[in-house]
Amino acid sequence: MAINRWLFSTNHKDIGTLYLIFGAWAGMVGTALSLLIRAELGQPGSLLGDDQIYNVIVTAHAFVMIFFMVMPVMIGGFGNWLVPLMIGAPDMAFPRMNNMSFWLLPPSFLLLLASAGVEAGAGTGWTVYPPLAGNMAHAGRSVDLTIFSLHLAGISSILASINFITTIINMKPPAVSQYQTPLFVWSILVTTVLLLLSLPVLAAGITMLLTDRNLNTTFFDPAGGGDPILYQHLFWFFGHPEVYILILPGFGMISHVVAYYSGKKEPFGYMGMVWAMMAIGLLGFIVWAHHMFTVGMDVDTRAYFTSATMIIAIPTGVKVFSWLATLHGGSIKWETPLLWALGFIFLFTVGGLTGIVLANSSLDIVLHDTYYVVAHFHYVQTMGAVFAIMAGFIHWFPLMSGFTLHSTWTKIQFVLMFIGVNLTFFPQHFLGLAGMPRRYSDYPDAYALWNTVSSIGSLISLVAVIMLLFIIWEAFSSKREVLSIELPNTNVEWLHGCPPPYHTYEEPAFVQVQRSF
């Protein structure tokens, strides 16, 4: 019965599929919200109403894209599908908890949408800073609903993280060491450790905000001896690792895609890649205050956070050059996933360079809360995380469905999307350097040109997203079956055929390890 299969599933492949479908649906909502933002900003003057409704849309766009699109797709979707197949496990360590992790997300999403639907909505930005998020500036239940939504999404992620960590450490064949697992498995391991360490801090911060709003505590209210800066420290101690949580699984997927389409049996510098991911994970926890350069920190504190932030560029550079070295000398197959991966490498590097600019506290004081930061963030996320999702989706779609996507149309869709996102976000660097602040629904006429260009870019991206839906429909409609897979011995997820049987590795895999070191 369909209800038993999908509602009560304990199968990692089915739960992965549920995550992918949920993430795609949330992605449509998040895209719609982003188009409302760009429609409002396409011309000077007001379109949708006041700043409150505009900021509700901005806040919802951020939460939907982060918690209900990127994380469910990368960690829940690709993680569930691929990790057990890549390590030879019959399923996840805790299959029923896996099911609960997924089913906590739709109620969480519902609470977030409800927060926008009651009173005036939560127009706080995704950071939910008090006193704007307090009960004076945001009377009513909107912010409370947002907090409960975040609680549920957080519990979901923590449970999934426990599940992945246990699975990856305990469910490998005995002969396989951790340093022989694929890089995607490593990326999920590092990501889930980051989630496990950072989410409880967010939970503490938003719970304190909840009691400040409803129970008259004063954690963040100077009138009772509290400090709103404490909230910023708690939030960003989660918020900075979060952006690495969003990109690390993408790093893992890009490593697989680049190696596969370069015709290599493994990525260049495997150990360097692993240690780089662990270094990024560690450093991600000790740089949070670079989001707070404008709150009046000591000069030595600012110096520390500036240098610590710049250090993250080193392991990131190790990864970028290892991807390029993997491509070097390969028999390159110019298929769509590789195009997405190459776009990722180039544009993520551009985003990383603007990150180096923002790491300088003196420069950041000028650029903070301008569109320069928006441009930086969207270069590393839209053109990092989303490009990685696209590369991984097109690469593994035949594995998950048994059908192949139309290669020419996916290439056209890549070109459209590439033009769209660059046209959307590149001009925002100019707006930021010219001093246009974020989170305002209107602007002086001087900023009109680049805002118009940016909004046109967003419409091109929309066409590309709609085209992707058509391409997926076309694949299921035409039913072109997979013919052959190259190098299934080094890409073990393909070993069982496309799609793999409902249950794989029912007997423990026999692994004979050849040690080359």
Curated annotation (Swiss-Prot):
UniProt record, GO biological process: electron transport coupled proton transport; mitochondrial electron transport, cytochrome c to oxygen
Membrane topology field: Multi-pass membrane protein
Binding site for heme a3: H376
One CC-aspect GO term: respiratory chain complex IV
UniProt: Cu cation binding residues: H240, H290, H291
Cofactor annotation remark: Binds 2 heme A groups non-covalently per subunit.
Cross-link (1'-histidyl-3'-tyrosine (His-Tyr)): H240-Y244
An MF annotation (GO) of this entry: heme binding
Catalytic activity: 4 Fe(II)-[cytochrome c] + O2 + 8 H(+)(in) = 4 Fe(III)-[cytochrome c] + 2 H2O + 4 H(+)(out)
Protein's pathway: Energy metabolism; oxidative phosphorylation
Subcellular location: Mitochondrion inner membrane
Positions contributing to Na(+) binding: E40, G45, S441
Membrane topology (Mitochondrial matrix): 1-11, 87-94, 171-182, 262-269, 328-335, 401-406, 479-517
Residue spans, topological domain Mitochondrial intermembrane: 41-50, 118-140, 213-227, 287-298, 358-370, 434-446
Positions with a binding annotation for Fe(II)-heme a: H61, H378
Similarity comment text for this entry: Belongs to the heme-copper respiratory oxidase family.
Subunit structure: Component of the cytochrome c oxidase (complex IV, CIV), a multisubunit enzyme composed of 14 subunits. The complex is composed of a catalytic core of 3 subunits MT-CO1, MT-CO2 and MT-CO3, encoded in the mitochondrial DNA, and 11 supernumerary subunits COX4I, COX5A, COX5B, COX6A, COX6B, COX6C, COX7A, COX7B, COX7C, COX8 and NDUFA4, which are encoded in the nuclear genome.
Function: Component of the cytochrome c oxidase, the last enzyme in the mitochondrial electron transport chain which drives oxidative phosphorylation. The respiratory chain contains 3 multisubunit complexes succinate dehydrogenase (complex II, CII), ubiquinol-cytochrome c oxidoreductase (cytochrome b-c1 complex, complex III, CIII) and cytochrome c oxidase (complex IV, CIV), that cooperate to transfer electrons derived from NADH and succinate to molecular oxygen, creating an electrochemical gradient over the inner membrane that drives transmembrane transport and the ATP synthase.
Record protein name field: Cytochrome c oxidase subunit 1
Gene: MT-CO1
